[in-house]
Structure formats: structure tokens, C-alpha cells
Amino acid sequence: EERDRPALIVVDQRMSMFFGTRLNMKSVTAAEAAALAAFRILDQGDRVGGIVFGDNHIAEIRPQRSRRSLDRFLMALADANAMLRADVQRVEPMPLTRVLRAVARIAPRNHLVLVLSDFDVVDDETERLVSGLSRRNDLVVGLVTDPFGDAALPEGLKLVISDGALQAEIDTGDHARRRRLEDMARGRIAGILDWRRRYGVPVLPLSAGEETLPQLRRLMGLGPV
């Protein structure tokens, strides 16, 4: 196994990740998975760094083989996660394209790149950048979801959805609207999962409704703790 390969862990801590219905917020699951992966990478003798981003900030830690670099990454994770609050003022979400361009700059080739996100708002430019990163690096996607988004929406709920600037209330008792929401969520997730076929990118599903460590061990083919 190759040693001292640089690894870059990219962690989404935008407001779209500040959502959870069963166990964790998606932001917490992503942060836990990132921390566990970082420790494992450093223990294997490889360099580790990361990009941690929210809606209006981005922190870059270039890969190094040192505990100090790991500590900087963990601190960036903790700081970004602490900024997520229900009463935070709505801002324009950080575009994934901006983050992926930063990834391409820091990891031009021959890096392990792990991206942990719900991949909210993916467009053609996002996919072009994903394709380019996958050709020059070992790109792995951790698709973070919540069980609420994986199942049929219950009737009789009034949901407030937002794109970061505008808000709208949706009544799930409206069958047509509920079906459109379900189709949109499933279509977005299916599109990300299809990156394996289109770009050869491994897509690892991570649920905020389960403990993070057992999921990672299962995805890596390891037994229970």
C-alpha cells in the first residue's frame, strides 16, 4: 500500500447540513466522519489536510503528516459546526463550485480527496469539476442524508423550505406538492449516486439517523467495534 500520499478531506457545514430528524444533524455526521477519517489517514502514515466550509466562510488546511495539522483541521471543524444555529441570519449559500475549485488548486493530482456533503444545489459546473477531480485524483464522495429525506413525507405537516434567501411554506397534505417534493429529493440523491457510473467516483451513503462509526466500518468492510 502506498505511503505518505496526501489526503484532503472536504467537509460541508452549510445551513443545508443543519438538519436532522432522528439522531444527528447532517453537519454532525459529516464532521464525525471527517474526524475519524483524518485520524485513520494520519495513523497510516499519510499526509492529511482539509477544507471546511460554511455559507460564508472557508478554511483550508494543506496536507501535512503532523498532529499539529490534524489539530488545526479538527479545530476548523469544531468552529464551523459551532456557527450553525437555528437563529442564524440567512445568507446566500456557499456555491459548491467555489469549494471544488479550491480543491483542484490544493490537490492538483495524485491526492485522496474525500468530500462529505449533502450536495445541495448541484449544477453542470459542479459535475464538470467533479469529473475533472476524479480524473486527476482518487475522489471519494460521502453523501450525507437524513432518514426524513429517504422516506415518503408524512401527511399533515407544514414545512418551511428555503434557498437561503427566500422561504416558502408547503403543506404536505397537498398530495401533488408532496409527491413533487419526494420526487425532487429522490432525483437529487439518485443523480449523485449515478456519479459512480458516470465518473467512476465511489459514492458512500452516510445517514444522519445512524451512529457514524459503525457506518464507516461497514463501508470499509470492517467488522463491528
Report the location of each language-model feature.
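Exposed, interaction-prone extracellular/peripheral surfaces
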Residues: 1-32, 39-225
